[in-house]
Amino acid sequence: MSVRDGVPLAADTADVWLGKAVVHLAAACGVPASALDDLTKPALGGTRLAPGARAFLVRLDESRLCVLCAALAAEATVNDYIHSRRPSYRGMLDKLSVPEKFSLAPRLLSGADLFPPGSRVYEHLVRLFALQRELVQAWPHPAAPGDPADGGQSERFNPRIAHELLESVARGAKALGDLHEHPYRPTVGLALKVVDALAKRAEAAAAVPAPTVAELEEEEETLTAAAFAEEMIGA
């Protein structure tokens, strides 16, 4: 089963959110769901991003959705690890933040110091959950015509950042899975292949400058006029 088809019903919650995060990351890089299978093949075409302000904002939305789903995948992953190793520890460890769980749980339950504070995965998890909090606490703000149409969010939620954070979540999930006698969750391996294949696309998508409010309004006026003209011709 491919990533774009989702995951089997028997898969755990972590796999569901990880799969969704991968799909949103691909969309943020301008890759449609129908092309996900091809990403894991050696021969890949060049990156093609749809032009325009609206397309930019769609990719930004997909980056934000990737961040939200990656955070849910990370939390479900470490909770699944704790429950599978020592269910009686859940109450104690539930008092910790998700990055703290990733750091402490492997040491406590498996004697493995995988994600100490300062490590790449740990620091990316801290950043991931800071961004998640920012998204769920967002407030609208007035913008002038020359201001970025995204309110400056592409500086924090662009495809490159979403890619980095999702990669760390997937690698963290793989490391926790490898602590078992038989590594579990094959979806993690597939997700890592797709994430690796999206690296250059994420960089290219993140390099596109944010449109201004005026540019977005001009594009919307043009599209509205074109739609009206098409309707009149067809009448």
Task: Describe the role of every protein-language-model region.
Residues 2-12, 71-76, 103-104:
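Short N-terminal helix-initiation segments at or just after the protein's N-terminus
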Residues 10, 17, 62, 69, ...:
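Amphipathic alpha-helix face/heptad-repeat signature
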Residues 19, 26, 30, 68-71, ...:
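A broad detector of short, well-ordered amphipathic alpha-helices
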Residues 55-65, 117-120, 154-157, 161:
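Non-transmembrane, amphipathic alpha-helical segments
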Residues 59-83:
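Short, hydrophobic, well-ordered secondary-structure elements
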Residues 75-152, 162-175:
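Flexible secondary-structure boundary motifs
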